[in-house]
Amino acid sequence: MKGHKKNENETNIFSKNDINLEDIKAPECFEIERRLKEEMNIPVFHDDQHGTAIVVLAAIINSLKVTKRNIADAKFVINGAGSAGISIAKLLMRAGAKHVTMVDRIGIIEESQEWMNDAQKEIAKVTNREHLTGTLADAVKGADAFIGVSAPGVLTKE
């Protein structure tokens, strides 16, 4: 605009770009994101990871407000240890969640399992503090929230 003097914030906002990654499967998406962040000085957003995690955290925050509960005390089960599930777990923990258990098609993710990819091994170190073992059915016992980001129909009434 003529006569408009840019301030520092406008210069920072409008002079930068970002990278939006879309539909890149795990575990490749984690390595691509990591390398881009290392090599480029711009934000990297992976819709499947970060977009999903943001929406889930918003829903969790609202449900906790309605039920007058604290995120640190709530128990979360995330079914699906791919890009979305891992990112949801990370964001929940950054928001203060202490009790997050992840489940994949083989069962509850534990640090000692050898079949996991690097991203799953990393998240296994900071989740499942109760050292649960077993299946999804075992994981959801006593849980306050179930977050499903895998195949449909895996959670049954039983």
Name the predicted role of every residue range:
Residues 22, 148-149:
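Short, well-ordered coil/turn residues at beta-beta hairpins
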Residues 54-143:
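Glycine-rich phosphate/diphosphate-binding loop of Rossmann-like nucleotide-binding domains
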Residues 30-31, 88, 112, 156-158:
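Short glycine-/acidic-enriched loop or helix-start segments at secondary-structure transitions
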Residues 18, 144-145:
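Short, Asp-centered acidic motifs that coordinate Mg2+ and/or phosphate
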Residues 45, 101-103, 147:
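Hydrophobic/aromatic beta-strand patches that form the interior of the parallel beta-sheet core
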Residues 1-74:
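Glycine/serine-rich phosphate-binding loop and adjoining beta1-alpha1 elements at the start
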Residues 32-35, 39, 140-142, 151-158:
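Rossmann-fold NAD(P) dinucleotide-binding segment
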